[in-house]
Swiss-Prot record:
Pfam families: EPSP_synthase. Monomer. One of its GO terms (cellular component) is cytoplasm. It comes from Desulforudis audaxviator (strain MP104C). This is 3-phosphoshikimate 1-carboxyvinyltransferase. GO terms for molecular function: 3-phosphoshikimate 1-carboxyvinyltransferase activity. Phosphoenolpyruvate binds at K21, G94, R122, Q169, R346, R388. SUPFAM superfamilies: EPT/RTPC-like.
Length: 429
């Protein structure tokens, strides 16, 4: 599919973004391990989350929906999970594969999990290694670093593990495995990463404690199903936020967006660039902080994005590079080498596609350097099969001088079904 973006004067009005992808995955996982019904609204019916749904259905869990944005999981406890009759397919979802590995490691049956061609190239050794330390038998290509991966699970031993890099997925996989261990599991982070797993484990009744940079989960009593309204995904909101900042007549309010402090690095970085952004009506939904975000057109300036800020905005770096292209001065992004092993090499893809549109941008081994301001020219872009690259190119095209074409844009459905329609409904021609 091809997406055509024409220049816009701005974005105006109120909008809601789809439910948070990270939380939607975890609702299905914990709802499947819990006893009783879990009913979630504002669930993201994107391709990645649907892969998680399919995996748990294959393990014998009764899941109704998603019907629109509502899903019901009728959990019967972890002992009700059964060996899948076929290979589990995580599709393009690294979250599905890595977190599922943690759960499968604790099950008394054999599983094989794989994914599409892109996911089969992404490294899994950071997860499989510590799970093997906990007692799981795991086999796969290149010493269990590449899928397909086979797991012979069973009773695990709790461990104390220091993450070699900041990774919410690795932390989450080990905490989920810790539910099935014979003693507590402690995970220590080099810097804070998104904490949705800890919050949701506690909400479902698990015994979770945080002390400094460490999180501990105990072999848990029975998890209990619950009702949850999933907040809007700030990673999806980021595309509208940057689009409003760089188009000249914008005044946009995004409603009910998750503002978990481990995810709001995008707001901090843009504030450092001079963005006119305000957050109002703070509240809680399902144990997660939620608020409305108002964004107005702004004159941006260059900044440095590095260190502990990176895990708090890692998914937003492609669209931050778009903001930087329109900012006055130099923006330096570093400590982001992890982006090279996402759905695409996001550093290379961002540099290539923004260069195509006329940006002054270059790669470094662990980041990007962008000089602005530049009025981008429009042109023909490749999504690289990566939803975040496709949407970043679309945002860049809104403020360009001519039409922008994004090829292979169907990948956007991974995280934001209906993105183009939502964008068009807000634009000033």
């Amino acid at each position: 599919m091809t997406l055509k973006i024409t220049p816009a004067r701005g974005l105006r009005g109120e909008a809601w973004v789809p439910g948070d992808k990270s939380i939607s995955h975890r609702v299905v996982m914990l709802g499947s391990l819990a006893r009783g019904e879990t009913a979630a609204t504002n669930f993201l019916p994107g391709e990645d989350c649907l892969a998680t749904v399919r995996c748990f259905r294959a393990l014998g869990v009764e899941i109704e929906g998603p019907d629109g944005d509502t899903i019901r999981i009728r959990g019967r406890g972890p002992e009700a999970l059964t060996e899948a009759p076929d290979v589990l397919d995580a599709g393009n979802s690294g979250t599905t594969m890595r977190l599922m590995l943690g759960i499968l490691a604790g099950q008394p049956f054999f599983s094989v999990i794989t994914g599409d061609a892109s996911l089969r190239r992404r490294p899994m050794g950071r997860v499989t290694g510590p799970l093997q330390e906990m007692g799981a038998t795991i086999l796969g290509r290149r010493n269990a670093n590449l899928a397909p991966i086979a797991v012979a699970g069973g009773r695990l031993s709790g461990i104390r593990y220091r993450l070699p890099v900041a990774s919410a997925q690795l932390k989450s996989a080990l905490l989920l495995a810790g539910l099935f261990a014979d003693s507590p599991t402690e995970v220590t982070e080099p810097v804070a990463t998104r904490d949705h797993t800890e919050r949701m484990l506690a909400a479902f009744g698990a015994l979770v404690a945080r002390r400094g940079s460490s999180v501990t989960v105990a072999p848990s009593p029975e998890l209990c199903g619950r009702e949850i309204r999933i907040p809007g995904d700030i990673s999806s909101a980021a595309f509208f936020i940057v689009a409003a900042l760089i188009t000249p007549e914008s005044d946009l309010v995004l409603k009910d967006v998750g503002v978990n402090p481990t995810r709001t690095g995008i707001l901090d970085a843009l504030a450092n660039m001079g963005a006119r952004i305000s957050v109002s009506r703070p509240r809680e939904s399902g144990g997660e902080p939620v608020a409305d975000i108002r964004v107005r057109s702004s004159a941006l300036r260059g900044t440095v994005i590095e260190g502990a800020l990176i895990p708090r905005l890692v998914d937003e770096i492609p669209v931050l590079a778009v903001a930087a292209a329109y900012a006055d001065g130099e923006t330096v992004i570093r400590d982001a080498a992890e982006l090279r092993v996402k759905e695409s090499d996001r550093l290379a893809a961002t540099r290539k596609e923004l260069s195509t549109l006329g940006a002054d941008i270059r790669e470094t081994p662990d980041g990007l350097v962008i000089r602005g301001p530049r009025r981008l020219t429009g042109g023909s872009c490749n999504s690289h099969g990566d939803h975040r690259i496709a949407m970043a190119a679309a945002v860049a095209g809104l403020a360009a001088s001519d039409v922008t074409i994004i090829r292979d844009s169907n990948c956007i459905d991974v995280s934001f079904p209906g993105f183009a329609h939502a964008l068009n409904s807000l634009r000033l021609e």
